[in-house]
Every structure is written in C-alpha cells, then in structure tokens.
Curated annotation (Swiss-Prot):
CDD domains: PROF. InterPro entries: PFN, PFN_euk, PFN_sf, Profilin_CS. Its main location: cytoplasm. It is found in: Cytoplasm, Cytoskeleton. This is Profilin. Occurs in many kinds of cells as a complex with monomeric actin in a 1:1 ratio.
Amino acid sequence: MSWQVYVDEHLMCEIEGNHLTSAAIIGQDGSVWAQSQNFPQLKPEEVAGIVGDFADPGTLAPTGLYIGGTKYMVIQGEPGAVIRGKKGPGGATVKKTGMALVIGIYDEPMTPGQCNMIVERLGDYLIDQGL
C-alpha cells in the first residue's frame, strides 16, 4: 500500500460527518512521504522543532508549534509521543512513530478529540508495523 493511501483513506477519512482540513506523513528528516492536496509546506526548522520537542519534551511550549508558517499554541500532549496544538477554533496533532511524523490539521466543526483519534490511531498502527 502506498503512503498516499494511508493519508487519503486513514487520515482524510470521515468521522461523524467531519474531515481533517489537511494531513501528512513526513519522515523525521523532513521528507514528505505523502500529504493531502492542501497540506502546508513544512519548513526545515519547523520539522527540526517538532523532532526536537519529541526528544526533549516541552521545548516548543514557549515558542509554539509551527506548521507551514502557522503558529499553534502547544497544549497537553504525551511527552515524546504526541504534540497537540491549538489555534482559534482549530488545531493540529502530531504523532511520532519510529520513522515518521503523522500530522493532522483540523478546524471546526471537527473537535480536537476527533483529530487526536484519527492521527493517533494511524500512528499507533505504524508503530505496531515497525514504522
């Protein structure tokens, strides 16, 4: 199965009538494995910041989580495993796997919990597969 299928069918899927705004699977080196059509272009320093926060949890809290130039306020996550960000009525969830970052971005009417469930479910599956 291609990485694009994971994005299209597992991240951009419908949940209770709602969809993520955009999603991607990114290598921890910043390489794009697959992304939705409207996923913002990640900058190298944004990927470095995300990877750095997984290695040393809490480093993004003072500065914010940046995805494609958009700043998200870092909210509670799972240190070393999940980073969650909020911006107005929307937000983002980043799940770290052994080799990748699974990223979902949402806006109303999707809830933070729905985004977390979609992103973390795929991330956990990839971890179980050794990825």
